Amino acid sequence: MKFIDEARIEAIAGNGGNGSASFRREKFVPFGGPDGGDGGRGGSVFAVADRNINTLIDFRYARKHVARNGENGRGSDCYGAAGEDITLRMPVGTLITDMDTGEVIADLTEHGQRVCLAEGGMGGWGNLHFKSSTNRAPRQQVDGKPGERRMLKLELKVLADVGLLGMPNAGKSTFISHISNARPKVADYPFTTLHPNLGVVRVDHEQSFVVADIPGLIEGAAEGAGLGHQFLRHLQRTGLLLHIVDLAPFDEAVDPVAEAKAIVNELKKYDETLYDKPRWLVLNKLDVVPEDERAARVKDFIKRYKWKGPVFQISALTGEGCRELIYAIKDHLQAIKAEEAAALAEPDIRLDERLHNVDQGQGEA
């Protein structure tokens, strides 16, 4: 299935039904009172996050989604039926924005999360509501309210723990296929990857994490060059970036250090928060480098690149160094989760302390 990560749709809720201006008519009751029922509520348009859906392709071709109108009220105190709601199932990770106002309506980050995109109009009142001691035969009724109508932009930001950065043909697809269940297209030419790939890495029976591979970046990507700029947003939810560098490019005129710096510059120009994410350097294709030259080449790269963060040396093709990298990633992600859990627990601790102080004050009084 083709991966579609952006779509524009129109959500149109149903109009409320009109109230009825009706009077009771029965034999021997010539002056029956008002009995006009209310109109039904218009149907609403909802979105629900579904982890079984991976793309927005359905919304690329079906752009208008219209809920039913509420039925009009009738006599004999009959209320109109409510219009049927419609539910749009979207991938987890979908960001929904109102195109007219720029308001972010929802960020679907959890399976089953439900949000209203367009609310149906309220039904109008029948003349039954207008009866009073001075107006025994009211002819007033209220029309139903129109339903909401919204133009919406859908953006899919995949939910991954780790994101892969790198130039085209750096070996990202080979790496993700070696460590996970993902099977992206792998070939010896640039831009083999044309859309994001997700892979689940199982460390053991109980622990796993998700890796996202996006098309390779080139210089000028932040301004729209190449393919990768279209998919950089998929890295915004990750907790760790792996910058994969081809340590032994086929073209000897290519400088890996210059390419690595170009990637980082594009990242910074695109999004400062993405640039500030934890980032590890992964030097790939060691199998192509003679063993007696590896240490010197790695040392030279780090020196010229002026890198002070974590460095891993791997061969995505043979698997050399991949196991150590996987366990390091697992430890890093566990540390992040522990910090988040501790941060969430801190307010509870402060609240307990305040309650304890209040109890002590009451005891002294």
From Swiss-Prot:
Co-factor requirement: Mg(2+)
EC class of the enzyme, as a word: hydrolase
InterPro entries: G_OBG (IPR031167), GTP-bd (IPR006073), GTP-bd_Obg/CgtA (IPR014100), GTP1-OBG_CS (IPR006074), GTP1_OBG_dom (IPR006169), GTP1_OBG_dom_sf (IPR036726), OBG_GTPase (IPR045086), P-loop_NTPase (IPR027417)
Keyword hit for Transcription regulation: no
Binding site for Mg(2+): 173, 193
Subcellular location(s) per record: Cytoplasm
Primary localization class, coarse: cytoplasm
Domain Obg: residue ranges: 1-159
Residues binding GTP: 166-173, 191-195, 213-216, 284-287, 315-317
Record PROSITE patterns: G_OBG, GTP1_OBG, OBG
Pfam families given in the database record: GTP1_OBG (PF01018), MMR_HSR1 (PF01926)
Record's GO cellular component terms: cytoplasm
Subunit structure: Monomer.
Protein name: GTPase Obg
Organism expressing this protein natively: Cupriavidus necator (strain ATCC 17699 / DSM 428 / KCTC 22496 / NCIMB 10442 / H16 / Stanier 337)
